[in-house]
A protein has these predicted regions:
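N-terminal glycine/serine-rich phosphate-binding loop of ATP-dependent small-molecule kinases
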Residues: 2-114, 118
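Gly/Thr-rich phosphate-binding beta-strand-loop-beta motif of the actin/hexokinase/Hsp70
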Residues: 26-49, 143, 147-171, 187, ...
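Glycine-rich phosphate-binding loop plus the immediately following alpha-helix
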Residues: 57-64, 132-134, 139-148, 172-217, ...
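Glycine-rich phosphate-binding loop signature in dinucleotide/nucleotide-binding domains
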Residues: 78-81, 146-149, 238-241
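Short beta-strand-loop/turn "lid" adjacent to the catalytic site in phosphate-handling enzymes
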Residues: 78-132, 168-175, 179-180, 210-221, ...
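A short, acidic, amphipathic alpha-helical segment used as a generic capping/interface helix at domain edges
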Residues: 224-238
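Long hydrophobic alpha-helical segments typical of transmembrane helices together
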Residues: 238-284
């Protein structure tokens, strides 16, 4: 009984907080389901009001996701009744239906899903367009709002993906490789004496590490930066020297700053792209 009443008080507190933010339904939610995190953005009158993240938990139930979403909304003083509509993009099919069902528990608003049938403004020149991750398409849409191609999107999560958009605004292909955090974790797990290191800590001043940790930092920070620079040069060779590069996701700042290629980092690139696609399709 004590646990029940504790839960009752907790849930009551949540709903009381949400009640403070009640208003007219004018909030558009964007939901991006990645392999590691679920990113939720809230827009009012074309302005991003909040952006929050949840852990992408494959074991969480619909009800648990509904509670997590409600908590996040309450944290930003948004009531479910304020939601006018929304859009969801996902690279984790197993979670797509669960998160959509959780959203429908909270709101009767219509949620679009990024996929065939939605207009994006980007033509896909790929062997199988259905295989393109929603995050990459949304990133390309947001980057093109800054200006026409050629450009490339660098999306860093568990993997690093780089996708190219040519001067005709066509997404024409790219590369996928393991992200530095994943590679480091695999290396540490499969060796006896290599320690875990913090890739967000500054790399040594010299590429020549003088101890094991410094060698790992140089290898992963400068090595990943050099890898990205090399790929960027190859992208420019195919797309043109004026190619612009955008990055988003969990690529550590240390790696971005070690790159010699000018890269525009935008934390909300995918979120902004989702909202742009919603605007194109809101009356569909």
């Amino acid at each position: 009984m004590l646990v029940f009443w504790g839960e009752f008080a907790y849930y009551s507190l949540i709903y009381n907080i949400v009640d403070v933010g009640k208003g007219e339904p004018d909030m558009i939610l964007t939901v991006n389901i990645g392999n590691t995190h679920i990113t939720i953005g809230g827009y009012e009158h074309d302005t991003l009001i909040f952006c929050g993240r949840l852990h992408a938990d494959p074991s969480a139930t619909i009800d648990e996701y509904a509670m997590h979403l409600l908590n996040l909304l309450s944290l930003h003083r948004v009531a479910p009744e304020q939601i006018e509509g929304g859009i969801l993009g996902s690279v984790v099919p197993a979670l797509t239906g669960r998160v959509l069902a959780a959203l429908r528990l909270l709101s009767t608003a219509r949620f679009l899903t990024v996929g065939p049938g939605l207009k994006s403004g980007v033509r896909l020149r790929l062997d199988n367009p259905a295989q393109l991750g929603a995050e990459l398409l949304c990133g390309a849409v947001a980057a093109l709002e800054d200006g026409p191609g050629p450009l490339a999107i660098i999306l860093a999560d568990t993997a690093i993906s780089m996708m190219a958009v040519n001067a005709r605004q066509e997404l024409v292909g790219g590369v996928i490789l393991a992200g530095p955090q994943l590679s480091l974790a695999a290396l540490v797990q499969n060796t006896a004496q290599l320690p875990q290191v913090d890739l967000s800590a500054p790399a040594p001043g010299s590429v020549l590490g003088r101890n094991t940790s410094a060698c790992l930092q140089s290898g992963f920070i400068l090595g990943t930066a050099s890898l990205l620079d090399g790929l960027a040069a190859r992208f420019c060779a195919e797309l043109g020297p004026e190619t612009r590069f955008y990055a988003t996701g969990s690529l550590p700042r240390t790696i971005r700053e070690a790159c010699r290629t000018p890269i525009c980092y935008r934390e909300t690139l995918v979120t902004d792209g989702l909202y742009s696609i919603w605007r194109r399709n809101r009356k569909a």
